[in-house]
């Protein structure tokens, strides 16, 4: 088991807790992390880039001028790609960029990303995360006290309006519940601030 300190809102250690090695103590595998990040980013791509091809451009049903006798190159339609208003050759079309990644691989990649944070001392476990009111200033002060003011992924067991709205306008801070934890955001943000309740929930979900 991995022992980590549990901090309070004043960054004081109140106790220590054990982390499940099957979730937070995995061997670091860059290949799994790369596959998971590519999988996530590919799913986010809209793939809406589209141009009109030769068969999509309006007009051009009539031969623009006679075949012989004009001195011009022979043409059959003004929709041909050599014309200014013609269709585009091999242009981008609407497509789906997402691809499959096995569920076991996704789970192992998430365990690996959590292990990266735990092993590099970029994870701060707090006993609880509560705000009396919706105040961005209070949230900034809390993160600064915990040493996580620059780039933070904040994970709680259940989202509350006070936490979400207080962190919404702080640059480089993202809030998620246990179901929203993912490989890309774990690697993207420098610090992981997570409540002890959320740690237990992740262990139940991923162990």
Swiss-Prot record:
Gene Ontology CC terms: ribonucleoprotein complex; ribosome
UniProt keyword Transmembrane helix, yes or no: no
UniProt KW keywords: Ribonucleoprotein, Ribosomal protein, RNA-binding, rRNA-binding
InterPro entries xrefs: Ribosomal_uL4, Ribosomal_uL4-like, Ribosomal_uL4_dom_sf
Assembly notes: Part of the 50S ribosomal subunit.
Role description: One of the primary rRNA binding proteins, this protein initially binds near the 5'-end of the 23S rRNA. It is important during the early stages of 50S assembly. It makes multiple contacts with different domains of the 23S rRNA in the assembled 50S subunit and ribosome. Forms part of the polypeptide exit tunnel.
PANTHER family: 50S RIBOSOMAL PROTEIN L4, LARGE RIBOSOMAL SUBUNIT PROTEIN UL4M
Family the UniProt entry places it in: Belongs to the universal ribosomal protein uL4 family.
Protein name as it appears in the record: Large ribosomal subunit protein uL4
Organism: Magnetococcus marinus (strain ATCC BAA-1437 / JCM 17883 / MC-1)
Organism classification: Bacteria, Pseudomonadati, Pseudomonadota, Alphaproteobacteria, Magnetococcales
